[in-house]
Amino acid sequence: MSQKTVLLVEDEDNIALALTHLIGRAGYALRRVASGNAALEALAEERPDLVVLDVMLPERSGYEICQLIRRDAVLRGIKVLMITAGGGEVERRKGMAAWADAFMTKPFAAADLTAQINALLAEEGA
């Protein structure tokens, strides 16, 4: 079985560094980009198993990226975990309305993030 791949879309370097460490430690291959347009370019190049997608990004929002993934016949099966510092029920509902598979509010515990990623990738492999 090949290693699962994660595309991390996060524009804040300090958060991206922490997430890169956590995701890598969990045993997943990782690619990080820092903007909405870079996310679309990365998705055109390769199909990850999971996209960890910040809501607030330069150029295009995470909501827009998620909707574009879901509308694309080739990409729509990719799992999407949206993350935001904006928090609150309204943001979570917007993320789920954009067809995200899961939504987490920063700050979150490392164990919670790892558990969520593991669960999404277990579903993907089922």
Question: Where are the model-predicted features located?
Answer:
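Two-component/phosphorelay signaling modules centered on CheY-like receiver
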Residues: 13-31, 120
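C-terminal output helix
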Residues: 108-118
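The feature encodes the CheY-like receiver
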Residues: 58, 76, 88
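Acidic catalytic/metal-coordinating carboxylates
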Residues: 35-38, 61-67
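Alpha4 helix (beta4-alpha4-beta5 surface) of REC/receiver domains from two-component response regulators
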Residues: 20, 64, 87-102, 115
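Conserved acidic carboxylate
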Residues: 10
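Acidic, metal-coordinating helix/loop segments flanking the phosphotransfer/catalytic sites
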Residues: 32-50
